[in-house]
Structures are given as structure tokens and as C-alpha cells.
């Protein structure tokens, strides 16, 4: 079973949280065309899956066809205009969890560069380019515990 995600803006930490929908989830799904969401499979992603990838700062579960368990992006206020309003990022991740398309590592990197960084470029705020991602699941960050840029070289 593929992971199902909900989004929650945490204004106290200025982060956008994407979390699996489960009985213990405190997040609320964003309104959208997704319908009812079901809990993820706890064993959907091998613990070492994606550990070799050069796309740094993302939990290794981000590269699974099951989708990420949880991602938290800093600079959520910048994302609010570019991403949250259209639900673009949650929609793409939801399609990914359903297996409607499969991204290679290059595809994932291109997706984040094009859809996240390119849209933030239009907002004209340089601080958003240092975007940090925290894992909220059992899959460890490639570069934990120090914050890192998405595209730090391996």
C-alpha cells in the first residue's frame, strides 16, 4: 500500500509538514481532489533505499515509489504563495504515491529545482534558496543532523 500524505502548516516553526495520514496524525489534509486518504504501510520502504543518492537533505524514503513518510520544508511562508495555494507539491507527491508516474533520481532533483526553487526565484527572496528539510519518520536524513542545502554534492 502506498503512503498517503496530509499537509500541515506549523506557524510556530515556520514549516510546511507533509505527514502520513494515520490514526495518530495531528495534521489535517489540505482541501483538494484527493478524497479520503488511508494510512501508509510501515514497511513500504527499505531502510537503506536511496542512501547512495546525491540529492542531499531528503529522507531516503523520498525516493521510494511509495512516496515520502514525512517531509518538513522550512521557509513555509515563501511556499504558501508558490506551492500551497495550488496544492502543487502535495498533488504531485500524491500522484507519486499512487504510482501514476515514477521519478528517477534525476527526475526528483529536476522536480524540486523546477517546481520549488524556480517558483521561489520569482518571489525575489534570496533566503529561500537555503531550504532545509527535516525528516519526520524512521528513515534517516542523508546529511543529518546538520541542516543542509538540497543539492549538496555527495
From Swiss-Prot:
Q: Which domain of life is it from?
A: Viruses
Q: Where is this region: Mitochondrial targeting sequence?
A: 68-117
Question: Which post-translational modifications are recorded for this protein?
Answer: A fraction may be phosphorylated in insect cells and HepG2 cells, a human hepatoblastoma cell line. Phosphorylated in vitro by host protein kinase C or mitogen-activated protein kinase. N-acetylated in insect cells.
Give UniProt keywords alphabetically.
Activation of host NF-kappa-B by virus, Activator, Apoptosis, Host cytoplasm, Host G2/M cell cycle arrest by virus, Host mitochondrion, Host nucleus, Host-virus interaction, Modulation of host cell cycle by virus, Transcription, Transcription regulation
Q: Which cysteines bridge via disulfide bonds?
A: none
HAMAP family in the record, alphabetically?
Answer: HBV_X
Q: Tell me how this protein assembles.
A: May form homodimer. May interact with host CEBPA, CFLAR, CREB1, DDB1, E4F1, HBXIP, HSPD1/HSP60, NFKBIA, POLR2E and SMAD4. Interacts with host SMC5-SMC6 complex and induces its degradation. Interacts with host TRPC4AP; leading to prevent ubiquitination of TRPC4AP. Interacts with host PLSCR1; this interaction promotes ubiquitination and degradation of HBx and impairs HBx-mediated cell proliferation.
This chain's function reads: Multifunctional protein that plays a role in silencing host antiviral defenses and promoting viral transcription. Does not seem to be essential for HBV infection. May be directly involved in development of cirrhosis and liver cancer (hepatocellular carcinoma). Most of cytosolic activities involve modulation of cytosolic calcium. The effect on apoptosis is controversial depending on the cell types in which the studies have been conducted. May induce apoptosis by localizing in mitochondria and causing loss of mitochondrial membrane potential.
Please state what the protein is called: Protein X
Amino acid at each position: 500500500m502506498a503512503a498517503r500524505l496530509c499537509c500541515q502548516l506549523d506557524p510556530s516553526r515556520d514549516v510546511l509538514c507533509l505527514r502520513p495520514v494515520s490514526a495518530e496524525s495531528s495534521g489535517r489534509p489540505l482541501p483538494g481532489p484527493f478524497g479520503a486518504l488511508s494510512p501508509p504501510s510501515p514497511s513500504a520502504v527499505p531502510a537503506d533505499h536511496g542512501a547512495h543518492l546525491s540529492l542531499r537533505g531528503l529522507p531516503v524514503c523520498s525516493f521510494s515509489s511509495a512516496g515520502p513518510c514525512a517531509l518538513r520544508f522550512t521557509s513555509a511562508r515563501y511556499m504558501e504563495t508558490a506551492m500551497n495555494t495550488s496544492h502543487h507539491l502535495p498533488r504531485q507527491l500524491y500522484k507519486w504515491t499512487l504510482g501514476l508516474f515514477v521519478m528517477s533520481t534525476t527526475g526528483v532533483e529536476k522536480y524540486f529545482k523546477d517546481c520549488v526553487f524556480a517558483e521561489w526565484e520569482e518571489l525575489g527572496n534570496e533566503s529561500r534558496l537555503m531550504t532545509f528539510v527535516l525528516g519526520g519518520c524512521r528513515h534517516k536524513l542523508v546529511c543529518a543532523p546538520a541542516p543542509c542545502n538540497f543539492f549538496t554534492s555527495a
